[in-house]
A protein has these predicted regions:
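Short linear motifs in intrinsically disordered/low-complexity regions
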Residues: 11-12, 142
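Generic N-terminal amphipathic, Lys/Arg-enriched alpha-helix
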Residues: 12-21
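Glycine-rich phosphate/pyrophosphate-binding loop regions near the starts of catalytic domains
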Residues: 19, 27-160
Length: 160
């Protein structure tokens, strides 16, 4: 076996690091998941659509389940914002598997110094997108991290 687990083979230096391309979807992200994530979390045989399929959502006992994290800069952009993106992406990935989205969980990681006005704009956008999709946020979580560590906020949206 390899001395160092690698995305590209057995000879990756130990100081290799994650880059932005690893989070951009496609073949590079698939290799990251296959080499690093699946050895720890794969193997659940009770799923109709499980992690190994590398789909955007899972199906367990007929229930479609999705989780998606969003970290974009700027958080407001032409045509939308991080909140609308989080709802739309989650609802879309559930619908693509033929299910009707029922409920969402929304987690926030807020950077110290984020303007409350920006937070309210994101929350209002999430609410509007939920109303358009016919779903509700029914649970969630909020954490705050030190200034300079995020670039604003990260939104995780999960749904069934």
């Amino acid at each position: 076996g390899c001395a160092v687990l690698s995305l590209w083979g057995c000879n990756m230096p130990e100081n290799e690091r994650v880059t932005m391309i690893h989070g951009a979807g496609g073949a590079v992200m698939a290799k990251l998941i296959e080499k690093f994530v699946l050895p720890y979390f794969g193997g659940f045989e009770g799923a109709e659509v499980g992690l190994e399929v590398l789909d955007d959502a899972a199906v367990v006992d007929g229930v479609v389940f999705k989780s998606d994290s969003h970290a974009v800069r700027p958080i407001f952009f032409p045509g939308g914002d991080i909140g609308r993106l989080a709802v739309a992406g989650t609802v879309n990935d559930i619908a693509v598997l033929g299910a009707e989205p029922l409920a969402l969980a929304c987690g926030f990681v807020l950077e110290e110094g984020l303007a409350f006005g920006d937070l309210e704009r994101v929350l209002a956008s999430i609410k509007a997108a939920c109303e358009e999709a016919g779903v509700f946020v029914v649970t969630g979580d909020t954490k705050v991290v030190e200034k300079g560590s995020l670039g604003g906020l990260v939104v995780n949206m999960s749904g069934i």
